[in-house]
């Protein structure tokens, strides 16, 4: 089963997208601090801060650690920063797409 990372976990669009993905393990993440609720450790991850000079490398390292095969980017700022690194991510078999609104994907 492949792992899909959905960014922008604070946004309702991210949760709607999560409900539409049924055939993959879904992990949600955000660079904003998320509430630390018991049992959510595997469902929510803290993403690197976009203003970090090593943002791309930190994001890639996290994807590799979680064995992510696809990143659904809900946050426009993250997409702006990650798009130029698309080739780098593809070399590690990590695909990503910007989700504007909610897409149904399985």
Regions found by a protein language model. Name each.
Residues 1-105:
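ATP-binding N-terminal substructure of ATP-dependent carboxylate-amine bond-forming enzymes
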């Amino acid at each position: 089963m492949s792992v899909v990372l959905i960014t922008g976990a604070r946004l309702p669009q991210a949760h709607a997208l999560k409900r539409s993905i049924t055939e993959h393990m879904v992990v949600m993440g955000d660079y904003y601090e998320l509430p630390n609720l018991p049992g959510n450790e595997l469902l929510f991850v803290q993403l690197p801060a976009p203003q970090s000079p090593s943002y791309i490398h930190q994001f890639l390292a996290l994807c590799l650690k979680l064995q992510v095969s696809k990143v659904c980017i809900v946050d426009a700022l993250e997409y702006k920063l990650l798009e130029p690194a698309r080739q780098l991510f593809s070399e590690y078999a990590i695909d990503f797409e910007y989700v504007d609104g909610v897409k149904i994907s399985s």
